[in-house]
């Protein structure tokens, strides 16, 4: 038997010396710290996207303006669109879900913390690649780069490759976070907390995670095919070589339509909690609201071809997309009715969260009302790809992501 001394205590780091806070935050697997990273990053990229948007509006303010060159404008548009969706709206929703949902169900942490940490790291890497690409050769193909514009014959630089890599890393990170959060909500609920007892915001997180698990791999598959086309002589989207440029539109719009629905689900989940709290009464028809969130996820994703009514698709598919878009009115209307019914007769406390929530409902109603017009086939042929269509989308997204997000943050 050896008489050599054994250590009494093994410590992580030097005794009496605490690591800096930023190192603790960067290496932590705690869901609250990871949620803070997503939230702080999302708000930072919101500011950057607003600056880019302001510069583009200054260019468009005067006819024949030379403030921005056409190439610079296209690059800024591509960067602003990617920042708004991949670096602000979805991370803001996931950050609040990741921070609050485990606490709402009585869990001390998440089920797969390292997977969630990897997801956040992938998102940070994607954001770095996107803006590092802007320093060299940024993408010039727009918010949703459509084939065959993305082929090497039209854009021979590496801008589209950088965009595809950045958005792919972000999307993969979102999928990892969704798996971790969904596993937590499924397995780590407090004893006796059945699904019908789960808070509405935690239920919105569950629906959003399922939605991300559906739409995320679709975009990853599309980005993989795009990279094969550009770098390994693939023909997935190559027109005239047996490829189908329209395939990119289908795959990408499935993701973007699902993301649109995800942002609305996040906003309605947060607003439902806020309205109930600041009205001083339980949420009216709580089960109907929870069911409507599921319906928004399903119908909002199935309506992806509503963005393609000016593309060469069959008339039957156009009517299918129109019907899915019009059917979306039902769950959204039910949620509005129940939220208003909760406010009526309540002891309202007009604080910042409730004011943001009411502003979000107003903006969402205007945006979705305009989207109803754009979902009609006859009107879409005239209004699609115009500033009116862009305004309708931005009304709903600003109402959901910005006002709804600020309401939840308060």
Where in this protein do the model-derived segments appear?
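Membrane-embedded and interfacial regions of multi-pass energy-transducing membrane proteins
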Residues: 2-410
């Amino acid at each position: 038997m050896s008489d050599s001394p054994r250590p009494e205590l093994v410590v992580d780091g030097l005794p009496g010396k605490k690591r800096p806070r930023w190192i603790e935050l960067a290496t932590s697997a705690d869901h609250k710290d990871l949620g803070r990273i997503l939230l702080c990053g999302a708000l930072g990229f919101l500011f950057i996207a607003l600056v880019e948007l302001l510069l583009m509006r200054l260019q468009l303010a005067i006819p024949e303006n030379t403030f921005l060159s056409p190439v610079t404008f296209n690059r800024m548009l591509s960067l602003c669109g990617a920042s708004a969706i991949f670096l602000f709206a979805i991370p803001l929703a996931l950050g609040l879900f990741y921070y609050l949902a485990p606490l709402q169900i009585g869990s001390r942490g998440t089920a797969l913390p390292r997977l969630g940490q990897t997801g956040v790291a992938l998102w940070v890497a994607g954001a770095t690649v996107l803006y590092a690409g802007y320093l060299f050769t940024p993408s010039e193909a727009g918010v949703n780069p459509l084939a065959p514009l993305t082929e090497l014959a039209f854009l021979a630089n590496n801008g589209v490759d950088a965009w595809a890599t950045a958005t792919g890393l972000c999307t993969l990170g979102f999928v990892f976070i969704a798996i971790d959060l969904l596993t937590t909500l499924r397995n780590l609920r407090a004893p006796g907390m059945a699904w019908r007892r789960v808070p509405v915001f935690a239920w919105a997180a569950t629906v959003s995670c399922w939605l991300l698990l559906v739409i995320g791999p679709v975009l990853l598959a599309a980005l993989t095919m795009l990279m094969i086309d550009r770098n390994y002589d693939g023909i997935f989207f190559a027109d005239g070589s047996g490829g189908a440029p329209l395939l990119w539109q289908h795959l990408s719009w499935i993701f973007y339509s699902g993301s649109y629905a995800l942002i609305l689900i996040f906003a309605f989940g947060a607003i439902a909690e806020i309205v109930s709290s600041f009205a001083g009464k339980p949420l009216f028809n709580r089960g109907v609201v929870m069911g409507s969130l599921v319906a928004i996820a399903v119908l909002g994703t199935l309506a992806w071809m509503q963005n393609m009514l000016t593309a060469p698709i069959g008339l039957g598919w156009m009517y299918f997309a129109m019907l899915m878009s019009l059917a979306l009115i039902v769950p959204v209307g039910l949620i509005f009715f129940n939220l208003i019914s909760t406010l009526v007769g309540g002891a309202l406390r007009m604080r910042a969260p409730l004011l943001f929530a009411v502003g979000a409902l107003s903006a969402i109603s205007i945006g979705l009302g305009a989207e109803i017009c754009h979902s009609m086939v006859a009107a879409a042929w005239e209004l699609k790809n115009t500033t009116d269509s862009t305004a309708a989308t931005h009304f709903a997204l600003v109402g959901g992501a910005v006002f709804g997000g600020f309401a939840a943050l308060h």
